[in-house]
Amino acid sequence: MANQSSAIESNPSGTSGVTTDSSPNKPKYPGIRLTCNGNQLVTQHVETRITDGGIFYPITPSTEGGEIYQQSYASGELNVFGHPKVAIECEGEHAAKGGATAFAVTGKRAVNFTSGQGIVYAMEQYYHAPGK
């Protein structure tokens, strides 16, 4: 414990945090430094990596999530399981929720980019999923 406290005190960058004994200038858990909003962070670093399909209706504030997912699909990126993605832009919230439900029923991981109002509007689609 004394080694870690001395590494913190001798950190020349002036930043606080736990450092490793082998490299006193670097934090133990440096993370990824970037500037983005919540839509960008979740879509780029989570949803495009773990899902098989992104189904959405472009409506503010969730439009950006669908656009980023489409860019990932267009560039041919694979998810962490090595599978290609599908990006589907629907004509309404009902269609988007129905598409995401159908995708999930077939055993695929799907994301539906929507807003609070979109969830309420497409609530009828939730009742179709059980029993299918």
Predicted stretch roles:
Residues 2-132:
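Thiamine diphosphate
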